[in-house]
């Protein structure tokens, strides 16, 4: 009986240790790409509404997704080991990103701030104001891409 409980404790401890390790670099790249891809798709929905038939509800919904994704802590997915291709996951991140954590934090903060402002402006339904804020929000994406994304 003691052996059983000792084995049970060992399994529990090992399981806890494995769970605390978090996702593997390959999985982090995959999740990161999915998150930014979903954000880009929602940016596209906003742009389509601004360029075509405007639907305030669609713009608000897409802006909320962008803001939620931007504020979700995706910066944690730029962890050690995710600076290069891993397994079948390719990354376009430049190695410099991992050497400038303060700049990355600043850029992610800018994205989150402008995306939250986009949500507020979208709620007004003012197309001109939404276009202006959409440009500011997209500019934060561009700033990061210019610094840290391979072409």
Regions found by a protein language model. Name each.
Residues 14-19:
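N-terminal signal peptide c-region/cleavage motif recognized by signal peptidases
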Residues 22, 26-60, 64-151:
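Sequence context surrounding c-type heme c attachment/ligation sites in exported
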Residues 4-13:
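Sec-dependent N-terminal signal peptides
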């Amino acid at each position: 009986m003691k052996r059983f409980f000792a084995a049970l404790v060992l399994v529990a401890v090992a399981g806890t240790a494995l769970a605390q390790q978090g996702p593997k670099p390959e999985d982090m790249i995959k999740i990161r790409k999915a998150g930014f891809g979903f954000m880009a798709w929602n940016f596209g929905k906003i742009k389509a509404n601004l360029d075509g038939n405007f639907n305030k509800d669609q713009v608000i919904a897409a802006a909320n997704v962008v803001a939620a994704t931007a504020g979700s802590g995706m910066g944690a997915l730029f962890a050690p080991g995710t600076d290069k291709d891993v397994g079948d996951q390719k990354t376009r991140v430049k190695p410099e990103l991992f050497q400038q954590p303060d700049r990355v934090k600043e850029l992610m903060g800018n994205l989150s701030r402008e995306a939250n402002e986009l949500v507020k402006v979208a709620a007004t339904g003012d197309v001109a104001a939404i276009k202006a804020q959409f440009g500011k929000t997209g500019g934060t994406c561009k700033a990061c891409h210019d610094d840290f994304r391979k072409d």
